[in-house]
């Protein structure tokens, strides 16, 4: 039986009639006639009404491709129950033992309608159903061809490859895809990993870049930004306060009507709008807003839909106070690069403190600006110590520049990183045949610098694990479904018009590899080259095929190497191109202190301590054995790491390779300048990290700490199996990770001490 429901027809475009034989004739624009055989029908009249047609002849008419159907008519996509039932009995293949399961339960296992948490097979079901429903809705909206049987077969294959962790959507996708966030609210920005915003045009709308960063960060999107707007505007200051006799209750409680009071709504939009009002009051010389925080939920209440628990209004009030304190000192002066970074960092601090997200930011500055280079020198800028940790700081390096001063700073605290914007604009992969200037509009990159981006652009990442495959043929099949997931995400527009203009034109994705160190160890570098070359070629062919089917542009770029972190832990893979710190090490992960995951871990004997950077998180230490024979990062020279990044930039990544090179400050520090002289022509970006084995006590609560076999055995001897089944009696709202799930995106600094914040 074919049913068409909720179809609204415009009286100026459509007329209908019904004859005695049950044939319904609908004239579309008085030209094209579509007929249905039916014994039951409800016809439209002169006004817009519902057309309800049942096809009792069951003739399988393909009606969904007609432009007539302005509302959804294709049945909602769902994987078959009998297919899912087979996986409900299979053990989830989490990597690294308890670590992979902790990360999953902490970050991606949503609470279901029956008030229990998802199991892995259910999370995968939600994600795959969500992916194919995005496709279905796009097809329906644009009158394209949809084959339900073909979709079911394709979705089942995607499901299997995610369940077995041959590829995984990013953490944002694992958490949000198929949830109310995308299905009913349509917040597709939550499926994207990263963004960039330039301050170059700050004069047109001074608060806009800051507001975009805050809104995106609260959706879990990591944001890069530049300082090109410095000196573009004067910080004017606020209008004088109203007369003392004017009482607050006498004022209108809506902004925009020459009034001061703003009741902050208990929503992401409300928090963002409050900051916009405050910034505009200084940039555009408007009234000083008076904020009423009474509508914001109390501390400890759950943040439904986006995960986590509320910390009350205090983080937002603190942000308001800090913005006022910062800008009051700058009235009458041009906005500086320091002002720009400070404002972005203060916003990031609020997002972290508010338990909404872990903010991930990267700042891009002028390599010739000593003011910018010194931002994380807290002897010079002690006032920044409480918030400067919120961004990685990098410079737009110029080809042929003198790297001496930059390298001096890198030796001090590992920053700044370097981004060669000329290379990012000019090349796809870094080979002469791909000097194509596809990204001539690019202005920066994302916080981990694996994606070239235009201003206000978002992009979606997806992660594949070559070492979890037995053959190239199997891996190429995985690439098909990994690509299809990422391409599907580009179908969803966002709430930001500026973003949609770029996103829908570029359709940029980043199909990544993790476990590269493992693959090289077991298969060799030459085989990796073969897989890269063949995989890259296939992705180009797949883009041709699926872009034609969906009637959208081909993706401007498709491949990258992201640093990974939590998602690679699920699959038991080393992160991105990076080698493990050691055969034996301690892995530290951050969990909200209110999380129900903490008691079972403490009961099992795992070490748990407060996180030093804020009062809302605790740090859990987990001993890891990465496997015999795998080379450790400490055994690989700086030059070899740079060579591997260059290899991947040449054979795989047309976006970028996220590469954090660890180095020996004593032996290799003097070579930094010379290394950059060579590799500036082979890379698009790179960052450096002083080797912890030679700089003891530099970092607090690092994500990784090298240990020896003796200490490893001592730790595990005191551990018991963790019983997570008790959590089913106490549902746990997960806390999704920041945009790219990486352990190297957010860097917390305290004087000379730096934290890679997971």
UniProtKB/Swiss-Prot annotation:
GO terms for molecular function: cobalamin binding; nucleotide binding; ribonucleoside-diphosphate reductase activity, thioredoxin disulfide as acceptor; ribonucleoside-triphosphate reductase (thioredoxin) activity. The active site is at residues 448, 450. Monomer. Its EC number is 1.17.4.2. Belongs to the class II ribonucleoside-triphosphate reductase family. GO terms for biological process: DNA replication; nucleoside triphosphate biosynthetic process. Disulfide bonds join 194-459. Pfam families: RNR-II_ins_dom (PF21995), RNR_Alpha (PF17975). Residues 233-256 are annotated as: Disordered. This is Probable adenosylcobalamin-dependent ribonucleoside-triphosphate reductase.
